[in-house]
Amino acid sequence: ILEATKNTDGLAAVMGHEIAHAVAKHSVERASRATLVNTSAQLIDIFSGGKLSQVNRTTGMNTVGLITQIGLLNPFNRKQESEADYLGMIFSSLSGYDIRETVKIWERMKELNKGKEPPEFMSTHPSSDNRIRDLNEKMNDVILDYPPIEIS
């Protein structure tokens, strides 16, 4: 991502995003969700007489895990990424950085990853197009609602 970060405003956007993950305790949420999903799958497997394990043996892969990842965990992770994007813009704006650079970063990332991005449903992150759209939709509100903090 540093290749797409061209200046201090861009660096502030990336740092704001990462700080937002910490402030929002996203790693704790992910661990809790993974534990819940794994425990639920084990209980279903036990109460179904091993049917989930049988599916995995029959297909030769962790089909249940893949379905869980795509259907439950990835959408949850994408939501966290979008939340971190939004909070990161707020943190950057409050700190006096130009948050318009956030969109420019994702435009550059889109170009750098051209043809390499997986379909969004298979990714833990929103697509560059969706990120750019969402950031643009929230930009003016963040600029108006979260002006730089004046320290005197």
Sequence positions of predicted segments:
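A Zn2+-metalloprotease active-site environment signal
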Residues: 1-152
